[in-house]
């Protein structure tokens, strides 16, 4: 966990930081297993600490397909499920069970939908992001597809689906995704997930130390050398202090 106080102050405030003290920024991709784990633990910690309704999660796009110039390889994703999933089974994990040709080739439309849902409030964007993650990781649904995204939105019971559909059709949130990608590749966002607080405190892949053996992502498999799920409590307590 690091603190970058220079980025948090003055006229040159870092755009990667939250706009308000009561929000926690999380840069991530929806089909990143470590981000799925992190978001599950963030939600659990917020509930445990009694901070629901006081601290919000501002989802920012870290599009792996744009960083890598390719689809997030399914062999790599599959190799992570049993390893990362074992750290928090309740998050919802299953190997892909739908036909192979329905595996998501992109998560950009889904990430755009999460940004569009912010117009309806933090509750809506949080619920949609969590629903889309579960749709992919647990339910083997193709979150590349517009109708699947809207179905998931309807299932949240908090997202206004017609409003979201209009935003997707107009592309009103697409520029936000690309702006977040640009800010992420400028240097301070190291990976998916990377968590930022209003004062510059941040943590990349919180609590996890991981390495790949017998090949890189898509060839070998991950080994978790360290896992500390308690790191989320001090992060959220600090966010609550900043929020006042």
Predicted segments, located by residue:
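Structural alpha/beta surface segment adjacent to cysteine/selenocysteine redox centers
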Residues: 37-140, 145-146, 234-242
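A short beta-strand-turn-helix
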Residues: 2-22
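An acidic- and aromatic-residue-enriched active-site/binding cleft used to recognize and process polar
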Residues: 29, 62-64, 200
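Intrinsically disordered, low-complexity proline-rich regions
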Residues: 1-5, 31, 51
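C-terminal cap of thioredoxin/glutaredoxin-like
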Residues: 27, 38-47, 134-244
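Short active-site neighborhood of thiol/selenol oxidoreductases, capturing the structured segment around
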Residues: 18-33, 38-42, 57-60
């Amino acid at each position: 966990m690091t603190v970058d106080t220079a980025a948090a102050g003055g006229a040159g405030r870092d755009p990667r930081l939250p706009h308000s003290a009561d929000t926690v920024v999380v840069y991530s991709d929806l089909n990143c297993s470590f981000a799925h784990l992190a978001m599950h633990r963030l939600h659990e910690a917020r509930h445990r600490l009694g901070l629901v309704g006081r601290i919000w999660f501002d989802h920012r796009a870290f599009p792996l397909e744009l960083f890598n110039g390719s689809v997030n390889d399914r062999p790599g994703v599959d190799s992570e499920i049993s390893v990362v999933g074992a750290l928090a089974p309740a998050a919802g994990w299953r190997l892909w069970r739908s036909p192979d040709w329905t595996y998501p080739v992109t998560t950009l439309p889904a990430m755009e939908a999460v940004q569009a849902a912010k117009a309806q409030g933090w509750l809506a964007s949080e619920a949609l992001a969590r629903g889309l993650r579960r749709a992919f990781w647990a339910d083997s649904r193709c979150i590349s597809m517009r109708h699947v995204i809207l179905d998931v939105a309807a299932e949240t019971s908090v997202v206004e689906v017609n409003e979201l559909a209009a935003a997707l059709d107009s592309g009103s949130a697409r520029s936000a995704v690309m702006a977040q990608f640009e800010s992420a590749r400028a240097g301070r966002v190291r990976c998916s997930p990377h968590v930022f607080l209003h004062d510059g405190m941040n943590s990349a892949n919180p609590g996890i130390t991981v390495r790949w053996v017998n090949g890189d992502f898509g060839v070998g498999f991950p080994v978790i050398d360290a896992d500390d799920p308690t790191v989320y409590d001090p992060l959220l307590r600090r966010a609550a202090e900043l929020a006042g």
